[in-house]
Amino acid sequence: TAGVAFGLFGTLLIYANAADIIPNAHEAAFLSCVLPYADKFDPTLMRLAFAFIVIGFGTKAGLFPMHTWLPDAHSQAPSPVSALLSGVLLKCAMLVIMRFYGFTIQAVGASYPQFSLLIVGALSILVAALSMFRQDDLKRRFAYSSVENVGVIALCLGIGGPLGIAAALLHCVFHGFTKTLAFCVSGNIQHAFGTRSLAKIHGVVEVAPATAALAILALLGLAAFPPFGMFISEFLTFAAGVTAGPMWLVVVVALGLTVAIS
């Protein structure tokens, strides 16, 4: 896809620069071998490479504005596939961005990668939160929730610091498990009612009590209610934002998450 092409091109830019710098060019493909020489990389080339990587792997992760494929894919795929897409594939793409994020900080400093991910993360949260209001399809609503939570991960990286990085990693894990449960439950609901339209789904407790109980757990987890894991990661996000980030951005994120939860 075009997104992967951008990510590959960004990776190749770093590889080509590394091959010219490190003593053994054959080791340029290994990030662990390249890291000690990060400060010798061309800053302009690294900024361009990081931009390509965010665009490329951000497309796979569903970050705004490369997120448009995600609701369609989730709504049309079988529920177990949607669970894998949201719980595993999106997080793998974000983990790739995390790897290059740390390397870019060592090469050009923290301001450029952090500011880029702050903006992309905040916009992903707000756009996804507002888009969820218009969705009647259960799986499309969950898909936009995935966009929002991937935005939270990007925002954590943008805030940076030990708390921000810890929040990003924890949110990857907790959201992966929670959203996997949510999509599996949506498949059970669709099987029981023959529809994904929220306007036509009523009385889940009477029709499928076990599914209803699991749905409540999934929704409480996605809403970041304590003691669920996403409460911990989002609490750390706000703590990191108050400690290291601009307060106006923390307010914007709080509003976006409030809209999404409601």
Language model features: what each stretch is:
Residues 1-262:
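Hydrophobic transmembrane alpha-helices and their helix-loop junctions in integral membrane proteins
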